[in-house]
Amino acid sequence: MIDPEILVNTPDIVRLSQKKRGESQSIVEDALIARRNLRIAINNFETLRAEQNVLSKKIAGSEDSDRPELMRVANLLAERVKNAREEQEKANSEWKKLLFEIPNIVSSEAPYGVEDKCAVMKTVGDIPEFDFEPADHLQLGEQLDAIDVSRGVKVSGTRFYFLKGWGARLELAVMNLALDLALKSGLTLLITPTLVKPEIMLGTGFLGRHEGEVYRLPSGYYLTGTSEVAIAGYHSDEILDISSGPIRYAGWSSCYRREAGSHGRDTRGIMRVHQFSKLEMFSYVHPQQSTRELEHIVSMQEKMLNLLEIPYRVSDIAAEELGTSASRKYDLEAWIPSQNTWREVTSASDCTTFQARRLNVRYRDESGRTGYVATLNGTLATTRFLVAILENHQTSNGSIRVPEALRPLLGQDVIER
């Protein structure tokens, strides 16, 4: 959640953020009213409790003849205290509810507008020029007996698939390359749970307006769409030592997404699916270091795409395209020859203290005072990378030239059937 002090003391900052997101600003006034109602309820409860304490002392020192009347008054006062406590709890619940509904405050650096207002920061690599009509990744994968969508549909339904033979080996090679990069860069590896409690999913900002994108089990647990969720909850209700720098993790997991809002989009192949693999970077840092850490995460993602010899561009995402938790976000988009366009294959987000406030993750400074950490995340490798590898490195006969960095992991220079 956002810093309540910012909402109470400088509500115009929150109103501007809501405006940039294209969302209602009325929730700001609703939240401020709820805050005032809470303060009134707290004051009323504390006043009655003070009266109750005075009366208790009076009863203790009273004469026997006065005690029945004092007890009658005490019983009436106890009922008023009980009602006041209930009103305070009700007011607090309303305040917390509205506070949780407000998305993170958008960075002043984030562009205004929707998707077409995203700012391209840079473009890296040469777009491949083919002397033949490039095939799409599914055609290539089927020719190589590496991707089997039809049997995925038969077994699990639409947007499922099998990676087979070279397809499975290629994904594992990509993941291992990313893992090696992460370990050499000092990240700690985690293999994370893919089932989490509702409070962890809520804490990371994936419920509310995003609830339709995640799978909820009858038990109440949620399947995670990214290991970001589990890693964000990993240090919940803890005080971290970040005095020597950021705490950085790389979490591997299978990921599950309903893709409820993408009906009819990317129905061919493995670009947008219900289950995929991902290695996710996640950082806990001092809030003043979050901008620098975001740049570090993006630099790691760029190293990975450069190793895979994939042309890409980096875009600063417009405010209306940001998720609930993100204050700022960069997308890294790979060139997809069959579509003659750029497509997002990985992203990096600065969530500032938004998730940490919800999950109660703090640090202690040199003076002994505690504060909330900032959390950031970014994908280092995912199944979607296979789309860009197959299409950018295809040859006229349907074989795939293996990027040099993957050759030691695959044991050859070319993938062919």
From Swiss-Prot:
Its EC number is 6.1.1.11. GO terms for cellular component: cytoplasm. InterPro entries: aa-tRNA-synt_IIb (IPR002314), aa-tRNA-synth_II (IPR006195), aa-tRNA-synth_II/BPL/LPL (IPR045864), Ser-tRNA-ligase_type_1 (IPR002317), Ser-tRNA-synth_1_N (IPR015866), SerRS_1_N_sf (IPR042103), SerRS_core (IPR033729), tRNA-bd_arm (IPR010978). It is an enzyme of class 6 (ligase). It catalyses: tRNA(Ser) + L-serine + ATP = L-seryl-tRNA(Ser) + AMP + diphosphate + H(+); tRNA(Sec) + L-serine + ATP = L-seryl-tRNA(Sec) + AMP + diphosphate + H(+). The keyword Nucleotide-binding applies. This is Serine--tRNA ligase. The gene is serS.
